[in-house]
Amino acid sequence: MKLGINIDHIATLRNARGQGNPSILRALKVCEKAKVDTLTVHLREDRRHINDNDLKLLKKNARIPINLEMALTDEMIAISKRIKPNFICLVPENRNEITTEGGLNLEKISKKKLKSLLTVCHSNGIELSAFINPNKKAIELAKKFKFQTVELHTGSLDKKKINNRDKENINNMINFASKMNLKVNIGHGLNFSNIKFIKSRKKIDTVHIGHFIISEAIFLSLHETIKKFQRII
């Protein structure tokens, strides 16, 4: 598996003081030195953490691929056309949420906007994925709507007592998506402990980690936390 690091919460910490520290460009350089495979940022409608200038700076300076998480809106489609990230992952957004609470409901998305985004992606060599719940219906819809990749929501593993049904389901859905000829990524709530429940690792392209990595970095340093996770996967 490859490792993608989400640095949104470095921007959250920076924004708490409204100045320039901690620097997202410094975080980028640490990630590159640690040989991270992908850098992920979520440009939210409310600009809660990453902002437009951050995205420009990262795209200009990054030597590793940029994965842009975004909602399916006209504004974000225009931004993606201008910035041209390497990857785009469509995610749900709710202004009142603390973090992403579940996968994107593909039945309810605008097919007109999706068609527009697919045109942007095809014209610029951008790989498009959808962040979805780990169930067959969502995976089948992703295939139907011509997504190249799915990122399966692993939040069911982020609790003190994880039941066997959740462990089995996420692994079964990884295998199911792979059989549908979709590239499979996973993310949300993963840490040093629960990543061990992911058994179908050969079917996974990239595991995306954000909040946990940044939290552990307070104690271990960002570089050492990344290296430890790489050793585990």
Segments from the language model and where they lie:
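Glycine-rich phosphate-binding active-site loops on the catalytic face of alpha/beta enzymes
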Residues: 89-97, 148-160, 203-222
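Histidine/lysine/aspartate-rich catalytic loop segments that bind and position anionic ligands
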Residues: 127-176
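Hydrophobic faces of well-ordered beta-strands that scaffold small-molecule active sites
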Residues: 3-7, 39-41, 66-70, 88-90, ...
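Glycine-enriched alpha-helix->loop->beta-strand junction motifs that scaffold or abut catalytic
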Residues: 35-37, 61-64, 82-88, 123, ...
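Alpha-helix-loop-beta-strand connector modules within alpha/beta enzyme cores
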Residues: 48-74, 107-129, 164-188, 192, ...
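C-terminal helical cap(s) of enzyme catalytic domains, especially alpha/beta-barrels
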Residues: 59, 102, 162-163, 215-233
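Conserved N-terminal beta1-alpha1 strand-loop-helix module at the mouth
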Residues: 1-85, 141-144, 162-165
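Catalytic cores of alpha/beta
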Residues: 74-84, 135-145, 184-186, 190-204
